[in-house]
């Protein structure tokens, strides 16, 4: 049986207040910052060999929605070929993400996986913040297809490859 190992761990400071220094920091930007640091710490691991990004998030909505694992991986500079998945298991979402990543490695399906958790309560506090901060402006400008719904993606694929209905 293959063995899964944790190569490193990084965490951000804990934001304790709606008036604190991190209260307006987007969770996808914060997670991307952590991922960039992990990449910098381990230059011997080529980012092209990362098989997946698995991130737990108890409230995957608003600024934390739209597959924060995938969005953060793009912001961190991982190749567009690296998929991402967001897992919601409420308080144990981050632990579940690490377990899922380990299982993927142990089963032989993948070799290198980013795994962890992200949460920012200040960005999901009320309905206006959920909608006001939903789309990351950097991602919208540089990777707009990340926000496409499946129907739009299907239309692009159908047109690109001449697939009839």
Task: Give the residues covered by each predicted segment.
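A glycine-/small-polar-enriched, mobile loop at the entrance of the PLP active site in fold-type I
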Residues: 55-63
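Short glycine-rich phosphate-binding loop at a beta-alpha junction
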Residues: 49-56, 114
